[in-house]
């Protein structure tokens, strides 16, 4: 059984609230879980103390048992100092113009100068 520490969505429509749970990786996102070990309320300001709540001893217990945290939860655990922060992945620059578009723009600029 592969265990994951992940977010389970709760709360009303347009008002997200998440429980941080330990669950079998095959179970649905909001389905059966083994233990609830914290909460995450994204509606609160980033510096609010109740935005992320973790039961630290249970988090360390499940990590020692081999549970893998998802990317978002791994960042929460890293900020709490219970595990090392995950490596930061660079976001690709998707909106940068491609090579041919840059060449065409350069040609238009030359034509406009002449």
Swiss-Prot record:
Region described as Disordered: spans on this chain: 87-114
Biased composition (Basic and acidic residues): 100-114
RNA-binding is among the record's keywords: no
GO cellular component: cytoplasm; small ribosomal subunit
Molecular function terms from GO: structural constituent of ribosome
Highest taxon in the source lineage: Bacteria
Keywords: Ribonucleoprotein, Ribosomal protein
One GO biological process term: translation
Presence of keyword Ribonucleoprotein: yes
Family: Belongs to the bacterial ribosomal protein bS16 family.
Protein name: Small ribosomal subunit protein bS16
Source species: Acidiphilium cryptum (strain JF-5)
């Amino acid at each position: 059984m592969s265990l994951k520490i992940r977010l389970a969505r709760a709360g009303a429509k347009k008002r997200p609230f998440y429980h941080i749970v330990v669950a079998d990786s095959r179970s649905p996102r909001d389905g059966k879980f083994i233990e609830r070990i914290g909460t995450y309320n994204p509606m609160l300001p980033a510096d609010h103390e109740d935005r992320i709540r973790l039961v630290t001893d249970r988090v360390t217990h499940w990590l020692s048992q081999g549970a893998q945290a998802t990317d978002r939860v791994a960042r929460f655990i890293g900020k709490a100092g219970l595990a090392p922060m995950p490596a930061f992945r660079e976001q690709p620059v998707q909106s940068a113009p491609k090579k041919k578009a840059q060449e065409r723009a350069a040609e238009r600029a030359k034509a406009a100068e002449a």
